[in-house]
Swiss-Prot record:
It comes from the Bacteria. This is DNA utilization protein YhgH. InterPro entries: ComF/GntX_DNA_util-trans, Competence_ComF, PRibTrfase_dom, PRTase-like. The lineage of its organism: Bacteria, Pseudomonadati, Pseudomonadota, Gammaproteobacteria, Enterobacterales. Pfam families: Pribosyltran. Could be involved in gluconate metabolism. Belongs to the ComF/GntX family.
């Protein structure tokens, strides 16, 4: 699937093993060196304890796993994936996220999910783009982790304004009742997968929907968290 098989997407040097698209040196360099809160994913004093923000007002999910801030070297790749139809990049980015998940499992005992779900696009946007980037991240993750993924588990009930230019308050209002759950999640350990989490409004709305319908736990996994 890679356009130049065996070359790293970031440094363009030959890969020593495999054809995942990002070499081990760049994989390590892409990870943030900041200490992040394990619950909200924002900079914190400790990486094993919830930050003060989460103690006062916890988000509607238990854990957030992210690779890095939304900045180079990952941000250009994510932009290519979403807006330049470079869907072949998705496997390389999924592997970065997988490595971060496995690291969190080794170091903090991260719970692996029963099911992972994508953040859905509105039908027209999905049609224009030709794919949902969250789906492309979920496909290999579900295979590698041996957990269920269904692209139709959560759907959008209506079109929403582009979140990028909205304040946090308007983002929350924009997304209210914008999602519908299509599958039972009672007692399930769920993970929401997205490419970038900014204010967290989108994943918060979906997490609340899952918890209202009986999900045991909810995590958020993303490539980048705007720090």
């Amino acid at each position: 699937m890679l356009t130049v098989p065996g070359l790293c997407w970031l440094c363009r040097m030959p890969l020593a093993l495999g054809h995942w698209g990002i070499c081990s040196v760049c994989s390590r360099a892409a990870r943030t060196d900041k200490t992040l809160c394990p619950q909200c994913g924002l900079p914190a004093t400790h990486s094993h304890l919830p930050c003060g923000r989460c103690l006062q007002k916890p988000p509607p999910w238990q854990r957030l796993v992210t690779v890095a801030d939304y900045a180079p070297p990952l941000s250009p790749l994510i932009h290519q994936l979403k807006f330049s139809r470079r869907s072949e990049i998705a496997s390389a980015l999924s592997r970065l996220l997988l490595l971060e998940v496995l690291h969190a499992r080794r170091t903090t005992g991260l719970q692996l999910p029963d099911r992972i779900i994508s953040v859905p696009l509105w039908q027209r946007r999905h049609w224009r783009r030709g794919f949902n980037q969250s789906d492309l991240l979920c496909q290999p993750l579900s295979r590698w982790l041996h957990c269920r993924w269904d692209s139709e588990a959560v759907t959008r009930t209506r079109a929403t304004a582009t979140q990028h230019f909205l304040s946090a308050r308007l983002r929350k209002r924009n997304l209210k009742n914008a999602f519908r759950l299509e599958l039972p999640v009672q007692g399930r350990h769920m993970v929401i997968v997205d490419d970038v989490v900014t204010t967290g409004s989108t994943v918060a709305e979906i997490a609340q929907l899952l918890l209202r319908n009986g999900a045991a736990t909810v995590q958020v996994w993303c490539l980048c968290r705007t720090l």
